[in-house]
């Protein structure tokens, strides 16, 4: 079972949107929670996601180094170059999980999109390989297409993603 810890300003609606599930599904999974009285630190069950402790993979992102590191049971498997958000549209920092995958999303997203548990943010490919290594995105983590395809084939939905400055 996967739990989300409520952050300042979040509502059940915003949490449902972040995890791409319906509000009714979220309420059904949390029958003892009053949707109008959430508090910071409260644990909310997110239906449909596995317990993250059962997933041996983890992704660490360093915005300043423009690197995404894939770990397996705490050991580095591979380090990928990435592009991140520019000054006005910075990549959010914090702890997230991969909530879905969409091959061939089209346009600037390259050949793969993996949604993070923050609405409108994800890890994706690119139609502009020269952007990798720079701070040029609208906040997403951009990778070479071959790299994001390899990553998506390796990590399951529910994989933890830690993004640091």
Curated annotation (Swiss-Prot):
Species, as recorded: Shouchella clausii (strain KSM-K16)
Family listed: Belongs to the YkuD family.
Molecular function per GO: glycosyltransferase activity; peptidoglycan L,D-transpeptidase activity
Record PANTHER family: L,D-TRANSPEPTIDASE, L,D-TRANSPEPTIDASE ERFK_SRFK-RELATED
Matches recorded under SUPFAM superfamilies: L,D-transpeptidase catalytic domain-like, LysM domain
GO cellular component, one term: extracellular region
Catalytic residues as annotated in Swiss-Prot or TrEMBL: 124, 140
Span of domain LysM: 2-46
Keywords attached to this entry: Cell shape, Cell wall biogenesis/degradation, Glycosyltransferase, Hydrolase, Peptidoglycan synthesis, Sporulation, Transferase
Pathway(s): Cell wall biogenesis; peptidoglycan biosynthesis
GO BP terms: cell wall organization; peptidoglycan-protein cross-linking; regulation of cell shape; sporulation resulting in formation of a cellular spore
Protein name (database record): Putative L,D-transpeptidase YkuD
Subunit structure: Monomer.
């Amino acid at each position: 079972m996967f739990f989300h810890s409520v952050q300042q300003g979040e509502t059940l609606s915003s949490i449902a949107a972040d995890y791409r599930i319906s509000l009714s599904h979220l309420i059904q999974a949390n029958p003892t929670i009053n949707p109008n009285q959430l508090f910071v630190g409260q644990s909310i069950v997110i239906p449909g996601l596995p317990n993250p402790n059962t997933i041996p993979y983890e992704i660490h992102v360093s915005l300043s180094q423009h690197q995404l590191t894939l770990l397996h049971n705490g050991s580095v498997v591979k380090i990928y170059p990435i592009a991140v958000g520019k000054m006005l549209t910075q990549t959010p920092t914090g702890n997230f999980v991969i909530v879905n995958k969409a091959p061939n999303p089209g346009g600037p997203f390259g050949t793969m999109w993996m949604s993070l548990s923050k609405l409108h943010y994800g890890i994706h490919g690119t139609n502009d390989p020269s952007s990798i290594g720079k701070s040029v995105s609208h906040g997403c983590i951009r990778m070479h297409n071959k790299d994001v395809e390899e990553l998506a084939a390796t990590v399951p939905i529910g994989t933890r993603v830690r993004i640091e400055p």
